Amino acid sequence: MDFAIIASAAVSAITPFLVKGGEEISKGIGKDLWELIKKPFQSDKDKAIIAELEKTPDDLKVQGKVEVKLSDLLEADEETAEHISALLPVVQEEAKRVTILIQDSKNVVAGDQKINVEGDFIIGDK
């Protein structure tokens, strides 16, 4: 079992939920993964790393710190590593469903994207 890959995938999968804020992480499958990620972080120093990720989830340096520490901790807790591995595909699919508000941006989005539009949809300036 490659703990570094599991840790990296877990942090990548949970980051969109953390960026959205507490209301998103507190429900559903994201909550389950987040609890599994936090489980091996028991010392005060380890908990500080998790708190830092909660505060600045889009900081790549912080994500890297969590990935390295999580990888080390999962080596000692293979059961949690297996649970995270099993949950990752479901969470990654859920994370693809992102709500984006683009307002007054004058930007163009291109690429192979599946976009569902709900609510008001206005093309051009109001």
Task: Give the residues covered by each predicted segment.
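Short amphipathic alpha-helical segments that predominantly mediate membrane engagement
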Residues: 1-7, 31-113, 117-126
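Disorder-to-helix initiation segments
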Residues: 1-18, 22
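Low-complexity, intrinsically disordered, cysteine-poor segments enriched in small/polar
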Residues: 13, 17, 24, 28, ...
